[in-house]
Amino acid sequence: MLTFALVAAAPWIVIPLIALWRARGDPSLDNESPEDTNEAPKVSVVIPARNEGANIAACVQSILMSRYPALEVIVVDDHSVDDTLAIARVMAGFDDRVTALEAPPLPDGWFGKQWACARGADHASGELLCFTDADTRHGHDLMSRSVHRLRSRRLDFVSVLGCQVMLTFWERLIQPQVFAMLSMRFGGAREVNESSNVIDKLANGQYMLLTRAAYDEVGGHASVRDQVAEDLALAQRLFEHGKRTELVEGRNYLSTRMYTSFGTLVRGWMKNIYAGGVRAAPFGWIGRALLPLALLAGPVASLVPIVVLILAAFGLVTKAWLAWSIITTVATFIWWVQVYVRAPVVGPARALRFAAIYPLGSLILAYIIVRAVIRGRRVEWRGREYVAG
């Protein structure tokens, strides 16, 4: 009985261990020196912004406080209905490094973010381009360290993984589960960088730094105009064109609060998880066809042990399955403890509480995935509807 339980439970034990091993030794901006200010190339920071009135001032201010000496900030308002553009214009009036633009009408076949980024790039004068989101906050040395990494390693593209700020119950419960699912697919930054397979390339659209020459050569954002995960698509396109791309940890220098409520969190991941995941599906058309099952595998694997354990409490399964459910539930709980401890949920005690209710998070994640699969390539975001390419 115990032998059966241990053998059957092996995937719940081995797969998390493999995931932890894959995430080891990630490159970090902590190991980079700031760029020499005497040789610093100009960086044009482009911020696409739609209804970001609550964020845009703090984002721009954090960039302007950078120790990097040669930069300009271009805020491109994507037809906001709040005061985003007005705030950006006020900031431009106080600092000549800031430019506030209003994007032209959105053409057919374009996503709003890519259109705004492309228009910002048109106005950029820097040798380097940096695309960042309005909900990010930049540390004083983020620009200097990322530029130094790009130049010292002769890279064409660097994307930084920042700290994901989570303040509400739902953020702390669900966000770590999504990121754990992504780590199961991609591993850590080191593995992404070392892979020679284009579908393994990944970027974080919250901070992407690249040379102007590489951006223009691959066609800029026009080349990924209809992609949900435009960051991943751009990194893959650069790699396909022989450019050197890198993903690097920078949680001490960049922070982002992606979603602020349960509703925005569900809608945001429903937009990205399936339509964006198609580009990263391995094994060609077979992988794309099986993507819904692959996405659901994680949350289902987390839920099955606890379901069997509940059935065992009512005497509905054999002793062998009871033993299996105990082993796998404990293994799954330990996995989620380390996931939540590594996430910024404010201390080990709180991480233990969230790990204890991991089935709720897994159930919600499964719900998000099912809804995303049903919608397919149809995407709704910020009051617009798109069809992903």
Question: Which sequence ranges carry the predicted segments?
Answer:
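Short, acidic, metal-binding catalytic loop of nucleotide-sugar glycosyltransferases
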Residues: 61-70
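A conserved acidic beta->alpha catalytic loop
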Residues: 69, 77-87, 104-105
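N-terminal membrane-anchoring/stem segments of glycan-assembly enzymes
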Residues: 1-37, 175-176, 188
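Cell-envelope/extracellular polymer assembly enzymes that use nucleotide-activated donors
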Residues: 41-44, 72, 233
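Long helical/loop segments within the catalytic core of UDP-sugar-dependent glycosyltransferases
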Residues: 11-19, 99-122, 145-218, 222, ...
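Membrane-embedded multi-pass helical conduit in multi-pass membrane proteins
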Residues: 291-376
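Acidic donor-binding/catalytic loop of UDP-sugar-dependent glycosyltransferases
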Residues: 83, 87, 132-149
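Catalytic donor/gating beta->alpha subdomain of glycosyltransferases that bind UDP-sugars
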Residues: 150-183, 213-216, 221-287, 386
